[in-house]
Swiss-Prot record:
PANTHER family, sorted: ALPHA-1,2 MANNOSYLTRANSFERASE KTR1, MANNOSYLTRANSFERASE KTR5-RELATED
Residue positions with a glycan: 86
Membrane topology (UniProt): Single-pass type II membrane protein
Region annotation Catalytic: where it falls in the sequence: 83-522
Residue numbers on the Lumenal membrane side: 38-522
Topological region Cytoplasmic: 1-16
Protein species of origin: Saccharomyces cerevisiae (strain ATCC 204508 / S288c)
Catalytic residue positions: 363 (nucleophile)
Family matches, as SUPFAM superfamilies: Nucleotide-diphospho-sugar transferases (SSF53448)
Taxonomic superkingdom: Eukaryota
Protein family per UniProt: Belongs to the glycosyltransferase 15 family.
Protein name per Swiss-Prot or TrEMBL: Probable mannosyltransferase KTR5
Extra remark beyond the main annotation: Present with 450 molecules/cell in log phase SD medium.
MF-aspect GO terms: alpha-1,2-mannosyltransferase activity; mannosyltransferase activity
């Protein structure tokens, strides 16, 4: 699987490939896609159900959409139990992105904020122009809008780093290797800022919650409830709408530094950690050598058989006739002598980063999930490693891994009912049945819809008045690897989550020894 992911990543990042190489890569990717992706695992982890994830009910007892359909927003707001939260939208942008900023604001206002009037915080590494601020205020309806400038220390790399040959050489080298955005210094700065500094800005610090926005994003469904309030009510601390694998060559050493941090600081991990890691501790045995050799379940039978065959051979002592007759034992002894222990390239302390991450250009979260001692120390540790410029660490994998140091799976919410697009990736749910129960009611004439046609409701749908683009494939189906892990873990008992059930090595060894002795005798 890792080889396949790396091949896909190489193809995605290889903008300078020649035609022949590109065709070969495309053929390989399509082949593996048919084998691995077109038949996603069912929610219980089996391959017996071939339905795409987008056509399945992924709700579990531990996490599900807050509402299974549209709600009457007017009644919701008038309910005495409704309490508006201390929350804000946050967007990092530049003066030249005004058109895309307005596009985002119009979309989130129409689908949500025209009813809830949450404030906006816009951040820029340069002062915002007056024209930019005026036009942004024109398109927000009844919401407070604040503009902030990021200070030099928060935006730029330290002078003892950025003024060195090593820094510029590392950036240029990433461009030469066609690492996506790797040669853009500004992109490295943005990732570093969002990884561990955005929540320190004074304008953001005023709030308990934030909802991240980007220029040029679209929302496809109406959000008729308050996500901040519902997260508070259900003890959720972080919410996402897309989870996908990262490009391997952007973060080759991120996990190594993370494991080093955990070891040095003695961090007690939350269960969310299991969402982002592959566990190689899949073989329970009293034999430490077997545990060390076996990384995959398919290796277990062969290694146990080898061990037993050699043990039986050695029991023959100095009887060379019996030794010579024991062909099975001799062959296994020779095989073991010639074998090298299989090294899993990115395995550290029996774990490997599986590359999954929450796509952080959309996230709704408590600021405290970042602004705490462990996460702040984690960011500082990564900062000192130089990975934000030596490699192209994105804020999405840093956020995801950093959150898993402290959060449990139950602290996280999948906003499956929120349709969302950024760049070329989109998630858009099917509408729930009965969307027509509560008709759309605009709070302002600018948001009135004429002859609006919504997607047909489905039994497994959860969206409210969604209108999904038809030409783009649903990300749950095209990159379902990480979604499958999420659903499998959430379907397990709290505190006992595993990707796969560990093999009982002692029991396997007992059965294999019995079979061996029946076949080959003493």
């Amino acid at each position: 699987m890792l080889l396949i992911r790396r091949t896909i990543n190489a193809f995605l990042g290889c903008i300078h490939c020649n035609l022949t190489a590109t065709c070969i890569l495309i053929a390989f990717v399509i082949t593996m896609y048919v084998v691995l992706v077109s038949e996603p695992a069912s929610v219980d982890g089996t391959m017996g159900n071939f339905l795409p994830f987008s056509k399945m009910d992924l709700a579990t007892k531990r996490d599900r959409p807050f509402y299974s359909n549209c709600v009457n927003t007017q009644d919701y707001l008038l309910n005495p139990s409704y309490i508006k939260q201390n929350a804000s939208f946050v967007m990092l942008t530049r003066n030249g992105e005004l058109e895309d900023v307005i596009k985002t604001i119009n979309s989130i206002e129409e689908h949500f904020n025209q009813w809830f009037h949450y404030p906006y915080v816009f951040l820029n590494d340069q002062p915002f122009e007056e024209d930019f601020k005026a036009k942004v205020r024109d398109v927000t309806v009844g919401a407070l809008v604040e503009f902030g400038t990021i200070d030099e220390i928060s935006w730029n790399f330290p002078s003892d780093v950025k003024d060195t040959f090593e820094f510029y050489n590392a950036i240029e080298d990433q461009g030469d290797r066609s690492i996506l955005y790797g040669n853009l210094e500004s992109y490295h700065k943005m990732c570093r800022f969002y990884s561990g500094l955005f929540y320190k800005h004074p304008l953001v610090q005023k709030y308990e919650w934030y909802w991240r926005l980007e220029p040029d994003v679209e929302f496809f469904c109406d959000i008729t409830y308050d996500p901040f309030l519902e997260m508070l009510r259900t003890n959720k601390k972080y919410g996402f709408t897309i989870i996908i694998p990262e490009l391997y060559w952007t973060v080759p050493n991120l996990f190594r530094h993370t494991k080093s941090f955990i070891s040095q600081k003695g961090v007690t991990l939350g269960s969310l950690w299991k969402l982002f890691t592959k566990d190689y501790d899949i073989f329970e045995s009293d034999d430490p050598e077997l545990r060390d050799w076996i990384n995959y379940d398919f290796q277990a039978k062969a290694k146990i058989s080898e061990k037993i065959a050699i043990e039986q051979l050695l029991k023959k002592g100095d009887d060379f006739q019996q030794i010579n007759d024991d062909k099975e034992g001799i062959m296994n002894l020779i095989h073991k002598a010639r074998s090298r222990k299989h090294i899993v390239e990115d395995k550290f302390f029996n774990e490997e980063y599986n590359l999954c991450h929450f796509w952080s250009n959309f996230e709704i979260a408590r600021l405290s999930v970042f602004d705490n001692d462990i996460y702040n120390s984690f960011f500082q540790y990564l900062e000192k490693s130089g990975g934000f410029w030596k490699e192209r660490w994105g804020d999405a994998p840093v956020h995801s891994i950093g959150l898993s140091l402290t959060l449990d799976l139950d602290d996280v919410h999948y906003f499956r009912d929120i349709g969302y697009r950024h760049s070329t990736i989109q998630h858009c749910p099917h509408n729930a049945m009965g969307n027509e129960e509560f008709s759309y009611l605009a709070s302002d004439s600018k948001f009135k819809r004429k002859n609006a046609a919504y997607d047909e409701g489905r039994e497994f749908g959860c969206g409210c008045r969604c209108r999904c683009p038809k030409k783009k494939r649903e990300i749950e189906d095209s990159m379902g690897f990480c979604v499958n892990i999420w659903v499998n873990l959430l379907n397990q008992q709290r505190g006992h989550e595993r990707h796969v059930e560990a093999l009982n090595g002692n029991e396997m060894e007992e059965h294999i020894r019995e079979d061996y002795l029946r076949q080959f005798g003493n």
